[in-house]
């Protein structure tokens, strides 16, 4: 349902998020928006939680995709140190939210590579 491209990346890299919405509560949504939380600089939080044009995902075939640079996506300064990233998906009016059912309904954790 949720993958990253490339599979090996660091939080300082541009990467893509792919969301296969079939089989989720967003299966009939015409628009899907990427939302989430960045933990940075010793535990500070930056959140993106509204459906706005800059976090709208692009429908490609049967899935939604969004490429992002995390510091820009979360509005962080260039010297911010991102420690953790979490994402979830909403429809245009925010009435439907899809999170990680396999992890107790928490946001999807995106781990950077050790490489």
Q: Positions of the model-derived regions?
A:
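Beta-strand-rich binding-surface signature
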Residues: 14, 31, 86
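Contiguous beta-strand segments within globular domains
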Residues: 5-20
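Aromatic-rich carbohydrate-binding modules that target alpha-glucans
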Residues: 30-79, 90-108
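Eukaryotic intrinsically disordered, low-complexity regions enriched in proline/serine/threonine/glycine
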Residues: 1-8, 62
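Exposed beta-strand face motif in extracellular beta-rich ectodomains
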Residues: 81-87
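Low-complexity, Pro/Ser/Thr- and charge-rich linker/hinge segments at domain boundaries
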Residues: 109-115
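A short beta-turn/strand-edge loop motif at beta-sheet boundaries
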Residues: 9, 22-31, 76-81
């Amino acid at each position: 349902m949720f993958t990253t491209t490339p599979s090996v990346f660091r939080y300082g890299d541009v990467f893509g998020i792919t969301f296969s919405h079939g089989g989720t509560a967003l299966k009939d949504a015409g628009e899907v928006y990427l939302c989430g939380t960045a933990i940075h600089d010793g535990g500070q939080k930056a959140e993106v939680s509204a459906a706005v044009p800059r976090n709208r995902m692009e429908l490609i075939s049967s899935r939604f995709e969004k490429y992002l640079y995390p510091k820009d996506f979360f509005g962080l300064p260039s010297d911010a140190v991102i420690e953790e990233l979490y994402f979830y998906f909403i429809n245009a009016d925010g009435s439907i939210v899809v999170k990680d059912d396999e992890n107790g309904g928490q946001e999807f954790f995106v781990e950077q590579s050790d490489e």
